[in-house]
Amino acid sequence: MLHLLKKYAFKDITMSMLVDECRINKTTFYRHYSDKYDLIEKISKDYISLFSKASSNFVNGINVHNIDCLIQFFDDNKDELLILESKILPINIFEDMHAIMTLDLCTYFKKSINQDDLIKLYASLISNNILTTIKWYHKNYLNFERNQIIQIVLQTVETGLEQSITAIMKKGKR
């Protein structure tokens, strides 16, 4: 399926294309999947399961190791995730990732903050920031080293976006 998604829009992929690409007959395909929607959902769930393992570290905090593990997940699955992000699909794997990471961060914040709405807001904002930064890095990684991205994520989480940009601007004037 992912190989076909490199070339075609999801809506244009036919059952014949799938069975030809997989070199199986329709009976074998239908034994495992009800249709192409079921197949893409199962593919997505496989990546979500792997992501969940990497994200689960965030229940213990936001640090270099945890961000590095998340970047490693994206490195290991870069091509596939970029395909899943670039196409119009009946699933949104990145929304699912955001929801998982937000829950992990909520678990962490509940250890020291006692306001559920505030916890959910901050966890969602931080999760979006981390995931957006890592996705951007994987599209533009030639311009940045991995450690730079980790430091940018940490700095924006710890001090806020505006202060992070101001610090970078001050360094640039030296």
Where are these regions (language model features)?
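C-terminal peripheral helix-coil segments that are non-catalytic and often amphipathic
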Residues: K139-R174
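Cytosolic nucleotide-binding catalytic cores of signal-transduction proteins
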Residues: K6-Y8, N114, L118, T133-K139, ...
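An amphipathic alpha-helix adjacent to DNA-recognition modules
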Residues: L2, K6, K11-R23, Y30-N60, ...
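Short, hydrophobic secondary-structure boundary micro-motifs
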Residues: T14, L82-L84, I93, R146
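Hydrophobic alpha-helical connector segments
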Residues: A54-L82
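Secondary-structure edge/capping motif, primarily at the C-terminal ends of alpha-helices
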Residues: F58, L81-L84, F109, Y137-Y141, ...
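Amphipathic alpha-helical packing segments from all-alpha helical-bundle domains
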Residues: C69, I88-T132, E162
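Short hydrophobic clusters on alpha-helical segments that form packing/core surfaces
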Residues: M1-L5, F51, F74, M101, ...
